[in-house]
């Protein structure tokens, strides 16, 4: 039986990646530091996924094992050495922390003279996630290790899309997900061409698809979350019923379509993107998905990053002379967002009260364009004054 190692036994790992790998006949080794989850996986070797729709459905995922990388790192290294594929869904900020372990797994494959090619795929909400991980892994490799990596280890970028709300169940492993799911892998970066995963779309150029997803789903979800928080809503579904919040979402979508059509006219049409964006609205409005605003709005500093879901579109729309007023408006709401249980929100509010505003904008967004910085400064002040 083919073996898969998956880092991250959280909701996306179990509720999406694990489902696809299991359907493709893989024995799956989940790697995580959550002892309770890992122990449960090793006791039951299976779990159920619930599909949150008008016609509820349960899917069984089996052939599973768990490895606690905090307690048993050597077992992770051995699992990577024996694996046919390695995947990850742990969050962009955590990727650097597993790089050394992945490097040791690659070194063990080299020591055992394994000449079977393998792909290591980061399934994260970021552009170039696998390439980013590869650079971090390379920091722990010798020159000869790097030659082996170049010949036998692929790091194809990927885009994943499925809404998995925050949830708690008596069954530790049970997870509820929306019906929609999409996993796209950059075929041009794949090393192991001996199999293709059913349920995965392969593209020769991933960039247009990952930008469509990040600038539509992630930017859109965040638009609803920060707009809902500003209006005092706690649940995404409730916020979306407010006409101003729906209007904000549609405004961001309109600007996103303009950018995608300007960048990728050979991949998308206005009609395609309109249909895609209408589908996204219906996904956010799924009455069976009760998603908390705080989950979607968490880590506001990260979401204000230079290559993230608002600042990157703003930069690229500005370069093309296209409107980005709706994106800019949400940036103002992100700076106004307050959640005492979110360390980044607390940190951002502290900096707003102590730092020069333009300097703070430069620090958080990485921007140097004075025009955009000034526009962000004005919209921050607008929401600061409105909240008084």
UniProtKB/Swiss-Prot annotation:
Superkingdom per UniProt: Bacteria
Species, as recorded: Lactococcus lactis subsp. cremoris (strain SK11)
One Gene Ontology term, aspect cellular component: cytosol
InterPro entries assigned to the protein according to its UniProt record, in alphabetical order: 6-PGluconate_DH-like_C_sf, 6PGD_dom2, Mannitol_1_phos_5_DH, Mannitol_DH, Mannitol_DH_C, Mannitol_DH_CS, Mannitol_DH_N, NAD(P)-bd_dom_sf
EC main group: oxidoreductase
Pfam family, one: Mannitol_dh
Catalytic reaction equation(s): D-mannitol 1-phosphate + NAD(+) = beta-D-fructose 6-phosphate + NADH + H(+)
Protein name listed in UniProt: Mannitol-1-phosphate 5-dehydrogenase
One of the protein's GO biological processes: mannitol catabolic process
Gene: mtlD
HAMAP family per the UniProt record, alphabetical: Mannitol_dehydrog
Family designation: Belongs to the mannitol dehydrogenase family.
Stretches of the chain forming a coiled coil according to its record: none
Keywords (A to Z) from UniProt: NAD, Oxidoreductase
Molecular function in Gene Ontology: mannitol-1-phosphate 5-dehydrogenase activity
E.C. designation(s): 1.1.1.17
Annotated NAD(+) binding sites: 4-15
